Amino acid sequence: LGNSLGGHIALLYAKFHPEMVKGLIITGSSGLYENAMGDGYPKRGDYDYIRAKSEEVFYDPKVATKEIVDEVFDSVNDRNKLLRTLAIAKSAIRHNMAKDLPNMLTRTAIIWGAQDGVTPPNVAVEFNSLLPNSDLYWIDKCGHAPMMEHPDRFNEIMFSWMEQYKL
């Protein structure tokens, strides 16, 4: 299970270790078109800027609670965390998976926010067309993090899909 850059990491793991992965769930995943970092965090010391950037991730900006904004603010201002995140993002840009996906036979659920502005819906459609054993599910009124914005619906889709394929 992976969201955003985590989805890309999960896809890479499934590519290199298919025998270890019975099923894969991706949401808002990078791997085709890289905008997961947006325009970055040029004003990372500016709390109001970080709050605004955090709110952009969600369809409903109120989901970006103070706790979430504080966590993002701390992460982008922690030099080690920021460098690791940037390294992962740069790796994602270098490892476009469009040519790999048609050969990946792992059963995959693609759960996507219908209003995702970070990895837009057309990316989900392309993942679905390239992954031969994939199912695409939409969550309406939802941005880039459906498991946070609509956790009950996300879990309902996920567990139903897992049950359907005995995963």
Task: Mark where each language-model region is.
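Conserved alpha/beta-hydrolase catalytic His-Asp/Glu region
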Residues: 44-106
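Conserved hydrolase catalytic core segment
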Residues: 1-33
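Short alpha-helix in the alpha/beta-hydrolase fold that links the catalytic acid
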Residues: 106, 120-129
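Catalytic active-site module of serine/aspartate enzymes centered on a nucleophile-bearing elbow/loop
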Residues: 134-167
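A short beta-to-alpha transition loop/helix N-cap that caps and shapes the active-site region
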Residues: 30-37, 61
